[in-house]
Structure formats: C-alpha cells, structure tokens
Curated annotation (Swiss-Prot):
Species for this entry: Drosophila melanogaster (Fruit fly)
The protein's name in its UniProt record: Transmembrane protein 186
Free-text function comment from the UniProt entry: As part of the MCIA complex, required for efficient assembly of the mitochondrial complex I.
A Pfam cross-reference name: TMEM70
InterPro entries, per the entry: Tmem186, TMEM70/TMEM186/TMEM223
Amino acid sequence: MLELLCRVSPARLPWRSCMSLAIQPAQRRRFATEAAGKRTETEKSAFTEWRTVYSMPGIRLVAALSRLKVYQAVITAAGTPIVFALGSAGQLSTDALAIYAAIGVTGLITLTLASYASSNLVGFIYVNEEQDLLKLAYVDFWGRRQETLIETEDLLPSWEQGSPSRLRFVSPICLRSDSKRRYKLLNRFGHVSDRQLFEGLFGN
C-alpha cells in the first residue's frame, strides 16, 4: 500500500480539482453566514413589537389604482381582435376599432404614469420599542404592499437634503447608505400619531 502511494506523483494530481475542493468549504461557510444573518434579521423583526407612527388611509385606493393598469392592458389586448372581427363582418363601423384602440392605449398610458408617480409611496411607518429601527410599508409599481427595515441613523433628515421637493405635499425619504433608494411621503393626506418622534426623524 505504501509503495502505491509513493508511486503517485503530486504533479499528476489535477490541481483544478484540488483548488475547487479548497474553495468550496469557504464559499459554503460564507453563504451560510449570509443566510444566517438574513434569518436573524427576519426573526428579530418578527418578534419585535411595532408601534404605528404614520398612516395614510388612502394607500389602499392608490394600490388599487396601480393594479388597474393590468386589467386595462388585458381588456385592450383581448378586445381589439373582437372589435376588428366585428368591423370586418360589418357589425361595427370602421372607426370603432380606432376609437376602441385609442381609448385603451390612452387609458393604459395614463394608468402607467400614475403608477410611476405613486411607486414607493409609503402608507405606514412603524417604530420598535428601542426607536432605532423603522419598518416602512409602501406600494410598488404593480400596486403590491412591500415592507423594508431601515435604521433610524440611516435616515437623512429634510434639513440635510440638498434641494427641497418641488411638490410641497410630498416629502422624500432619503437614506445615507443608498442615495438612489428613495421613498415618498404625503404630509397632507397622512395621519401622524407621534408628532415629536416624526419630526425628529424626518424633519418638519
């Protein structure tokens, strides 16, 4: 047995397989650490008691309006061949197809622009007991409710932002760690339950 081991030259061993065997445990440990960190953060937020700081009752109406463009697109796409067939059969005038398509496309464009305007609109803001972590519940482009956790130290107050918003009733929520990640807050249409804490976090 020893003679067979001595005959095997180390140079003949496939170095790529050796390197892959050495790298795989390190990658597995890194992925396991990242997964454990995500699970820990999720479990921590699940067992944390949250208190509502801000709420906007009309957020459900905004979400429904954002989802309406999907039905508009389906109705326009499905009804166009039917209107065209009826026009070819002489049941409808030739202008009916143009009118139907114009109404459908115009409505779809209007709803899409409204969805872009209401994207990342915050409906609820929660704070934990230690007041060092916020949970934002907002509406995405498709009208679905999304939630994200933000540390209070990562918030950029209004007095530290470069240029104020052109719309006075819209206040942007900016982060120090990611300048491209922004959320929208409606001051006039929302209800603030803790005014002192709200102004301390987001400004006047």
